[in-house]
Amino acid sequence: MWPDSEQTQELLAAAGNGEAAAVNNLMDRHREAVRKMVNMRLDRAVAARVDASDVVQDVLLEASQRMGDYVNNPSMPFHLWLRQLAKDRLIDMHRRHRAAQRRSVDREQRLNVNYSEQSSLDLAGQLRDHELTPAAATIRRELETRFMTALQDLAEDDREIILMRHQEHLSNSEVAEALDLSQPAAGMRYLRALRRLREILGSDHSGVLPV
C-alpha cells in the first residue's frame, strides 16, 4: 500500500536540500496510501459529517510544514511517521466530535465500508476455505460479509494489527516500530489477533492458517 522506500529516500534527500518540488512529490506519492489508511479508521458517525479527503489534506499539510524537523531528525521511516500523523489526527477528530455531540462513540471504532474489498477477501480466504464451490461468486460475497462483521467485532488492538498487516501491508518489523513493540511481541500480538478472528469466523473448518 505504501510507496517504495528507495524513491522516497531520494525525495527526502532533495527535500532536505530545500527543493519544494520534492516535498510536493512526496505528498503526492503518499496521498492515496494516507487516504486508504484514513478510510479504514474513520468512524462512521464522524464520516457522516467530515469528508475523508479533508482529513487527508490536513495530514499532508501538517507533514509538509514539519518536513524540516523530520529530515533533520528522522525518528522512523517516512511512511510510518506519516501514518502516525494521520492516526493522531483521527484520534483528535474522534475526541472532538464526541465532545461536540455530547454522546459516546463506541470505544471499539467500527470500520468504514470503503476499505479494500480485495484485501479483505484475500484474508478471509486464508482464514477460511481455500477451495470454492462452483457458486464461487456467492461464496466470496458471503466470505466478505462475514469477514467484515468479524473484523468489526475484534478488540481495537487486534483489529488494528490486522489492518496494519493485511490492509497497509506493513511488515512485522514495521508494525513493531509503529506500535513501539519488540518484533517478537508484535508477532505474538498478530498471531493472537488471528486466533481471535478465526474464533469469530469459525476456526473448526479445514483450510485455516496454522498458528
Where are these regions (language model features)?
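C-terminal edge and immediately downstream basic/flexible tail or linker adjoining helix-turn-helix-like DNA-binding
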Residues: 47, 112-114, 178, 194-211
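DNA-recognition helix of helix-turn-helix
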Residues: 147, 158, 164-167, 172-203
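Amphipathic alpha-helical segment used for protein-protein interaction
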Residues: 34, 113-160, 170
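Σ70-family region 2.3-2.4 aromatic/basic alpha-helix that recognizes the −10 promoter
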Residues: 31-35, 53-64, 75-99, 103-108, ...
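Amphipathic, Lys/Arg- and hydrophobic-enriched alpha-helical face
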Residues: 27-50, 65-69, 151, 200-203
